[in-house]
Amino acid sequence: MGFLSLFTKEIAIDLGTANTVILHNDKVVVDEPSIIAVERNTRRVMAVGKKALMMHGRTHENILTIRPLKDGVIADFQSTEMMLREFIKMTGTRGILFPPALKMVICIPSGITEVEERAVRDSAEQSGAKEVRLIHEPMAAAVGIGIDVLDANGNMIVDIGGGTSEIAV
């Protein structure tokens, strides 16, 4: 670990319709359902992930559970931002004296529009990212299983998610 790593943390995020997975230092540090529970009137976060899922359908009328992603893209920007912020807190990437500059790589579906792509980038930046890079989900899957994506050989990737399924060659 170098001196600069004290000031910068790099995380990779698979922001999925059903689940969100966050990696830091090649380890899965968050693997939670993509759901958030908030107070209906104040929009204060009550719970995210597994705790929010346990509340889903069993909550008091003043508590609202939200799945902020639909079909692989952001359907509720504010809820996505709050959920991401809470998941990032779970990663253990906080600094000792001040928060580190976060660099994020986020997976996106191949067929999303520029507006949907911008929503992902904005949500990450509002959640504290200083630098955001977006990568298509099939490419991330290929790199994740060790395929040399620059090699001249063809490979087929099938990515089956909760909201989208993609096949890439």
Regions found by a protein language model. Name each.
Residues 1-162, 168-169:
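Nucleotide/phosphate-binding catalytic cleft detector across ATP-hydrolyzing
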